[in-house]
Curated annotation (Swiss-Prot):
Source superkingdom: Eukaryota
Protein name: Methylthioribose-1-phosphate isomerase
Similarity comment: family membership: Belongs to the eIF-2B alpha/beta/delta subunits family. MtnA subfamily.
Pfam families noted in UniProt: IF-2B (PF01008)
Enzyme class: isomerase
Residues annotated as catalytic: D261
Organism for this UniProt entry: Paracoccidioides brasiliensis (strain Pb03)
Length: 386
């Protein structure tokens, strides 16, 4: 049974509360754009593609409700303004993720164009928006499978062909990933984790490694959860073990695949904090470093990583950890508790993301193919939009 992080049908939306994973499975209903803002900001739902979809669908839910109650304005312009204001509000919940801003801009243009039609009613504008938002959910899964297939083929050619190997592991590659980029971060299948899934399906995956991903532990809580769910051979490591793993030749790590929250026009990539360090390690150890992201994550309006705003999270997310109390062997897991793990009074710097320079990236995997650098070491990402 596939993992479902976003449940939507006929104007009803709920999200899998990822703060409780992997210990509890709880779905939170989303009734409004305000609900979505808080769910995204609190990281009950996270992952650049997922938060864009939840944002879009939350407005669709509000529109459905207004239509059913007969409270939607008949005026096309009023409905257009209502939608655009809601989208602008939700886009402020997590500023680094470009998918959220891109979706708000794209959907806003759709309703503006529709509202300008002669004789168009407010309901027709709302219905046009709802169709576009629902299509985002459908398209994301299809795009992710494309990313998985293109990424797996690239790795099989670049990281496996010609690589040394003997016995059972010959013709296979081990892959390291960071944070969570799977079904829990998207509408389904995933981006970087989708590449791992595709390698596993092709019997070309020797082993998957996932980092703990401090301080929010998306790797240990979420990625490990997905890998176990799918019965993919995998091992969890702490973030600080990555260098030792890459130096451990028998591990056979041939590629590091990560997701992205924003890719600048030159290929500089903002992703979960710790990604930059992994890219430096990959370069030193001769391991391929790949970014997996749909084209909606590519921001051609931002020339380089210097133009990407980096969100900073509350200090408590670093100094405290929440989880269930561990009982005896027969007792299982107890009630959820929060504990402190840092000295009182210590200052905290907690950026949610870092920016990996394009020079450290071997390829950017999109739903239409893998973009590589030219002979001068530059990406030409405009070509994926031609």
């Amino acid at each position: 049974m596939p993992l479902i992080a976003i449940s939507y049908s006929h104007g009803k939306l709920s999200i899998l509360n990822q703060l409780f994973l992997p210990h509890q499975t709880t779905y939170d209903p989303i009734y409004s754009a305000c609900d979505a803002w808080h769910a995204i900001h609190d990281m009950r739902v996270r992952g650049a593609p997922a938060i864009a979809i939840v944002a879009a669908l939350s407005v669709a839910v509000e529109l459905y409700d207004l239509i059913q109650k007969g409270k939607l304005s008949d005026q096309a312009k009023e409905v257009e303004i209502f939608i655009r204001e809601k989208l602008e509000y939700i886009a402020s919940s997590r500023p680094t993720a470009v998918n959220l801003v891109e979706a708000a801009g794209r959907l806003g243009k759709i309703v503006v164009a529709r509202s300008c039609g002669e004789g168009v009613t407010g309901r027709e504008v709302a219905e046009e928006y709802i169709r576009a938002a629902e299509k985002m959910l459908e398209d994301d899964v299809k795009d992710n499978r494309g990313i998985g297939e293109f990424g797996a083929k690239w790795i099989m050619k670049q990281a496996i062909d010609g690589a040394e190997g003997e016995g059972e592991g010959k013709g296979k590659v081990a892959v390291l990933t960071h944070c969570n980029t799977g079904s829990l971060a998207t509408a389904g299948y995933g981006t970087a984790l989708g590449v791992i899934r595709s390698l596993h399906a092709a019997n070309s995956l020797k082993h998957a490694y996932c980092t703990e991903t401090r301080p929010y532990n998306q790797g240990s809580r979420l990625t490990a959860y997905e890998l176990v769910h799918d019965n993919i051979p995998a091992t969890l490591i702490t973030d600080s073990m990555a260098a030792a793993l890459l130096a451990h030749k028998s591990a056979g790590v041939g590629a590091i695949v990560v997701g992205a929250d924003r890719v600048a026009a030159n290929g500089d990539t903002a992703n979960k904090i710790g990604t930059y360090g992994l890219a430096v390690l990959a370069k030193h150890h001769g391991v391929k470093f790949l970014v997996a992201a749909p084209r909606t994550t590519i921001d051609m309006n931002t020339k380089s990583g210097e133009g990407i705003a980096i969100e900073e999270r509350p200090r408590q997310e670093m100094t405290r950890i929440r989880g269930p109390r561990v009982g005896g062997e027969q007792d299982g897991l107890g009630a959820m508790e929060t504990i402190t793990v840092a000295a009182d009074g210590i200052d905290v710097w907690n950026p949610a993301f870092d920016v990996t320079p394009a020079s450290l990236i071997d390829g950017i995997i999109t739903e239409i193919g893998v973009v590589e650098k030219d002979r001068d070491g530059e990406f030409h990402l405009e070509r994926v939009f031609e």
